[in-house]
Amino acid sequence: MVLVRAADLGLRGDETPAELDANTAVLARLEALRLEAGQRMGMGDVTHSVLPKPVIVSPGTSPGSVVSRYFTPHQCHRSHAVTGAIGVAAASVLPGTVATDEGHAPAAGLRRVEVQHPAGRIQVDGQFKLVQAALVRTARKILEGTLFVPESAPAH
């Protein structure tokens, strides 16, 4: 999925599927973002693929909610894919995502997220749990040298 803030597209977020499908400038921008995201996700050229799916998000009308417009990928879904709702809800409980930035700060423990779509609402329970953290430190070079390996190693 490629989450995009409605405001970054000059949208309110509550546009109807018909309004979005008629907005060729927004559709072209979403497609450009989708193609770039496909490359950055390691999916290669996604021109002829349905993945990744673009999703427009904006603040919900109540606490713990997010407004979502899900694309398949070149037209707005009339309601919302369930798998897409799970992705939007997951993004809204993870720190630092576009959905979180829309005012849905992550909370400890299980949290219900209401994904508001053109045909209604989907309630998804989500929880952020850090399973692992890793890093590679590249601050400075600590070794440079040459290793000489004998042509034949002694038998043991």
Feature locations, PLM:
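Active-site proximal loop and beta-alpha junction motif in alpha/beta enzyme cores
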Residues: 1-156
